[in-house]
Amino acid sequence: MALRNVNRDFLLPMPVWDRAIRLFHWLLVLTIVIAYAGAWMHQPGLHRASGFCVLALLLFRIAWGFVGSDTARFAQFMKSPGAAWRQLADLPTRTPDRSVGHNAACGWMTVIILAALASTVGTGLARTAGQVTPHAQMAWILLGIIALHLAAILAYAAFKRQNLVRPMITGRKRLPGATPAPRMMNQALALALLLIAGAVSWAVSHWF
């Protein structure tokens, strides 16, 4: 703390992503890869199981977006479209992004990804009733959105020399010393929500 008072612009590693968000992110990556692999290898059982895992993770993330740590909350990172556009316009510059969590553009991307996941899962449930085409279409749309997400990560590395992947692994981001630390919620609450989400997804899997 004393160091922050010496130089308010000095960059210090600050916890920005809690364990729940990081675990959610990488489990989601894994289950999405398995879901697509199951579809391409014509393994419907694997595809279905991974799809319901995605549903559980999605339900958890939505809940954590309202009651979770500051940087996980929708209210913290959902800004106006104008703010997102200004953030995108600033992308080609060398000006470092000092957002504690998601900036405005990344916030919108997060919501778009969650919405695309929800649509893909929803059409997947409808697929069991014979509606195959919408699910396949959403799967391709989701791939496009994921590609855009990866392109943004590469753009930040190229233009701003910022690694967006490392903080999602370590939970820490280098920020000016005067930056207020975000509030982190008890991870036991996250575990309880994940278990509830898993139970709901399991129940849905027996309904469809």
Regions of interest found by a model, annotated:
Residues 1-208:
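Membrane-embedded alpha-helical bundles that constitute the cytochrome b-like, heme-associated redox core
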